[in-house]
From Swiss-Prot:
Protein name: 1-deoxy-D-xylulose 5-phosphate reductoisomerase
Function, as annotated: Catalyzes the NADPH-dependent rearrangement and reduction of 1-deoxy-D-xylulose-5-phosphate (DXP) to 2-C-methyl-D-erythritol 4-phosphate (MEP).
Alphabetical list of SUPFAM superfamilies matching this protein: 1-deoxy-D-xylulose-5-phosphate reductoisomerase, C-terminal domain, Glyceraldehyde-3-phosphate dehydrogenase-like, C-terminal domain, NAD(P)-binding Rossmann-fold domains
Organismal lineage: Bacteria, Pseudomonadati, Pseudomonadota, Alphaproteobacteria, Rhodobacterales
Pathway, per record: Isoprenoid biosynthesis; isopentenyl diphosphate biosynthesis via DXP pathway; isopentenyl diphosphate from 1-deoxy-D-xylulose 5-phosphate: step 1/6
Sequence similarity: Belongs to the DXR family.
Organism encoding this protein: Cereibacter sphaeroides (strain ATCC 17023 / DSM 158 / JCM 6121 / CCUG 31486 / LMG 2827 / NBRC 12203 / NCIMB 8253 / ATH 2.4.1.)
GO terms assigned for molecular function: 1-deoxy-D-xylulose-5-phosphate reductoisomerase activity; manganese ion binding; NADPH binding
Cofactor(s) demanded: Mg(2+); Mn(2+)
Length: 394
């Protein structure tokens, strides 16, 4: 029986993963080693019961008594806190879903790779902050990383069986978010509610706002660089409002291989769960005649400066990605709290990168996770200062 763990089980990716696992037979088909979640204890306990999980972990120690009570008599072990989540990753599983949002997902993902099994990576911050270290850890342990972002899953599939030396360019698509047709002045004055109203995808607040600012796409450009190893000048993003084409790969013979799929994360999750084969996934099928047209345009970097900043990070490499991600997370916190404006987020990130670029760690290829965490901490402090100054100017 195949074993699995789901980190971030109660988030949107975790819920979709749980749904697919249950459709494939649940506890009759899989041995669930570990499930982790946040404060939604009721849902975490429901999942643990349904999958007969060996271990359930909440990220918050104060929620542990409630989890213990909810799973009393089931035989499922319970634990709480960040250290408990990291230790859960030390339990070997054939297939692990890494879906914890933000830099918090880095530690369990790294530890899971050391078993030499398969890591389905939905946590893009892991590749952005520590891509070179992550990929090296996978190689050294004979582990496989499968991308779960719809764009990177699409690139992965388009490259199957291909000679990467013949790849001329990789194009990932962006919906453009809710502001794709807004003027710069209108974007500058947008509210949190407007920023989180995504036109195509059903997502959480933070990732929806990241999509609106195109910071999500900026992270994905860096992720493409780290996962597939292509030079920055061969990686680009285009705005594709229909969200049907997820990525394209251009080859040296002039051919362009495109991957089309529904705007449903279960497609990419299902591919990772069924890999190296394919299996039934309950998503809508594409009717090209009904769609009628697919459109593409280049993004406006004046309105969406995150893309320009991403190219700087792709060129610098080292731990610049860790600084970029940390600054982005702090800037997003301040925007959601109403302390800075929407366009101030990019300014905070740019000022943070400039401020920490003189640190020896900035351009260094990390040898250990501690270096990644040190740069993350340094950049967060710098970003807090930059955001504070922006707030004073409002």
């Amino acid at each position: 029986m195949r074993s699995l763990s789901i980190f971030g089980a109660t988030g949107s990716i975790g819920e979709s993963t749980f749904d697919l696992v249950m459709r494939k037979g649940g506890p009759e088909a899989f041995r669930t080693v570990a499930l982790t979640g946040g404060r939604n204890i009721r849902r975490l306990a429901e999942m643990a019961r349904a999958l007969k999980a060996e271990l359930a972990v909440t990220a918050h120690e104060d929620c542990l008594p409630a989890l213990r009570e909810a799973l009393a008599g089931t035989g499922t072990e319970v634990a709480g806190g960040a250290q408990a989540i990291a230790e859960a990753a030390d339990r070997p599983a054939d297939w692990t879903m890494s879906a914890i949002v933000g830099a918090a997902g880095l530690v369990p993902g790294m530890r899971a790779l050391k078993h030499g099994r398969t890591l389905a990576l939905a946590n893009k911050e892991s590749l952005v902050t520590a891509g070179q270290l992550l990929m090296r850890t996978a190689r050294e342990n004979g582990a496989t990383i499968l991308p779960v972002d719809s764009e990177h899953s699409a690139v992965f599939q388009a490259l199957a069986g291909e000679d990467t030396a013949c790849v001329e360019r990789v194009i990932i698509t962006a919906s453009g978010g809710p502001f794709r047709d807004w003027s710069l002045e209108r974007i500058r004055a947008c509210t949190v509610a407007e920023a989180q109203a995504h036109p195509n995808w059903s997502m959480g607040q933070r990732i929806s706002i990241d999509s609106a600012s195109m910071f999500n796409k900026a992270l994905e450009l860096i992720e493409t660089r780290e996962f597939f190893g292509f030079e920055p000048d061969r990686i680009e993003a285009v705005v594709h409002p229909q969200s049907i084409v997820h990525a394209m790969v251009g080859f040296c013979d002039g051919g362009l291989m495109a991957h089309l799929g529904p705007a449903d994360m279960r497609h990419a999750i299902g591919f990772a769960l069924n890999w190296p084969g394919r299996g039934e996934v309950p998503v809508a099928r594409i009717d090209l005649a009904q769609i009628a047209s697919l459109t593409f345009q280049r993004p406006d970097e004046e309105r969406f400066p995150a893309l320009r900043l991403a190219r700087d990070v792709m060129a610098a490499r080292g731990l610049s990605g860790a600084a970029f991600n940390a600054a982005k997370e702090i800037a997003l916190d301040h925007f959601i709290a109403g302390r800075i404006g929407f366009l101030d987020m990019a300014a905070v990130v740019e000022e943070t990168l400039a401020g920490v670029s003189t640190d020896p760690l900035f351009g260094k290829v990390p040898d250990a996770l501690e270096e990644v965490l040190a740069m993350d901490h340094l950049a967060r402090r710098a970003a807090e200062e930059a955001a504070g100054l922006r707030q004073q100017k409002r």
